[in-house]
């Protein structure tokens, strides 16, 4: 099971793999959704509704089943992650960050996080010590990017 982060959707549709060019990628991701092999927490949808492109927002509305509510087990796991890694949160953001919840979903379902974030070690002067890949590594939760998902699924587009 893949737990999808907002950054994956943004890079997929808004930056690198737009739907008008990479139709087969949309079909492959749709197959994962239909099979129940991927999910995103409801906070990811809220982030997309706030910062996503109009095309991405439209796509999300057509895939409402992808988004899972913040069940108690996810909330408890996310609270534990946020307590251990407080800099995962952005205090300047007007929205609640989905990051800990994305990780919690993968942790609870023995899944893999799919995020386009890079680790703090890969950044020149990171403003914080922990990003999704850093927390995943420390917690033993697998974390890959969208290209990693494509390779893991052996997709040839």
Language model: regions and residue ranges:
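Acidic, PIN/NYN-like endoribonuclease modules and their adjacent C-terminal/linker elements
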Residues: 22, 119-157
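Short internal beta-strands
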Residues: 39-42, 136
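PIN-domain endoribonuclease scaffold, especially VapC-family toxins
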Residues: 32, 42-96, 155
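Residues within well-ordered alpha-helices
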Residues: 55-56, 102, 132, 146
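Residue-level detector of structured alpha->beta connecting loops
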Residues: 37, 64, 107-110, 140
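Active-site neighborhoods of divalent-metal-dependent phosphate/nucleic-acid chemistry enzymes
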Residues: 70-134
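Short, well-structured N-terminal submotif of metal-dependent ribonuclease cores
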Residues: 1-40, 47-61
């Amino acid at each position: 099971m893949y737990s999808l982060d907002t950054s994956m959707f943004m890079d997929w549709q808004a930056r690198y793999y737009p739907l008008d060019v990479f139709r087969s990628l949309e079909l492959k991701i749709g197959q994962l959704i239909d099979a129940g092999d991927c999910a995103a927490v409801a906070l990811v949808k809220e982030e997309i509704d706030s910062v996503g492109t109009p095309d991405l927002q439209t796509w999300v509305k057509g895939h409402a089943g992808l988004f899972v509510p913040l069940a108690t087990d996810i909330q408890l796991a996310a609270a534990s992650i946020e307590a251990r890694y407080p800099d995962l949160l952005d205090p300047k953001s007007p929205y609640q960050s989905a990051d800990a919840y994305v990780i919690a979903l993968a942790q609870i379902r023995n899944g893999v996080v799919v995020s386009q974030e890079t680790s703090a070690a890969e950044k020149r002067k990171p403003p914080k010590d922990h990003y999704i890949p850093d927390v995943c590594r420390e917690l033993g939760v697998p974390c890959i990017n969208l290209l990693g998902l494509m390779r893991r699924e052996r997709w040839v587009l």
